[in-house]
Design a protein with these regions (language model features):
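Short alpha-helix
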Residues: 184-200
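Conserved class I S-adenosyl-L-methionine
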Residues: 2-3, 17-64, 169
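Class I SAM-dependent methyltransferase SAM/SAH-binding core
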Residues: 69, 75-119
Length: 231
């Protein structure tokens, strides 16, 4: 279920002014869940072939040195790590202080901010790509709709929106995820794809998978990956 200034090549901080505002993470239910899970989450999902395929497709579509926003960046791996290794400029945002600290250590080439993306300004056209891997599921449905529209506007024309979710029809359902209590909202596959269209993003690739997290409390979950382009 569901990424401070990083050093540039010269050793100086990269110029990353896309998201002004002070860091403000922690305190939310999602932060509590992922603070508790920490590196366990990365280990549980490390074998996801579908996530890797999604990242490979994204890399193939990005121009060199692209600016990428990673929403719900977690430990920084695999998303920020893969993008940074390819020379892209990555800004990760995550509500979990534990996850953000792990990411900063594991991917020092990227910048990570501990904050709730819903509270951050998202300047129009600031990014070449935005990744949202499984980071919407603890938001209410209307919050997901609104955030995807804001994220789409933060893309330059022709920019790429990449998202993954668990495609089930659920609104405020109490569940247990890797031993942690969560409240989940999501959309079925067709409804989720419709959110892209509503946001002005044309879906170019869609992939469904079934994944079992490598964790004692892991259970099979359907996964949906969408890649789209802003009109």
């Amino acid at each position: 279920m569901g990424d401070s200034q990083g050093p540039g090549d010269s050793g100086e901080p990269r110029d990353s002014q896309e998201l002004p505002g002070a860091d403000a993470g922690g305190g939310s239910p999602a932060a509590a869940v992922f603070d508790a899970l920490g590196a366990e989450y990365e280990r549980a999902f490390a074998a996801s072939a579908a996530h890797r395929e999604s990242l490979e497709r994204l890399l193939a579509d990005l121009a060199p040195g692209s600016r990428v926003l990673d929403v719900g960046s977690g430990t920084g791996r695999p998303t920020a790590r893969t993008l940074a290794d390819a020379g892209h400029r990555v800004l990760g945002v995550d509500v979990s202080p534990v996850m953000t600290a792990l990411a900063a250590r594991q991917v020092p080439e990227a910048e990570f901010r501990c904050a709730d993306v819903r509270d951050l300004p998202l300047p129009e056209g600031a990014f070449d790509a935005v990744c949202v891997y499984f980071s919407l599921l603890q938001m209410e449905r209307e919050e997901q709709r609104e955030l995807l529209e804001r994220l789409a506007r933060s893309l330059r024309p022709g920019g790429l929106l990449v998202a993954a979710t668990v495609p089930v029809d659920a609104a405020g359902v109490d569940a247990v995820f890797m031993g942690q209590p969560v409240r989940v909202s999501s959309f079925g596959a067709e409804e989720f794809a419709a959110l892209f269209a509503r946001a002005g993003v044309t879906v170019e690739w869609e992939h469904s998978a079934l994944f079992i997290p490598d964790h004692p409390a892991g259970a099979p979950e359907p996964q949906l990956f969408l890649h789209g382009r802003r009109s």
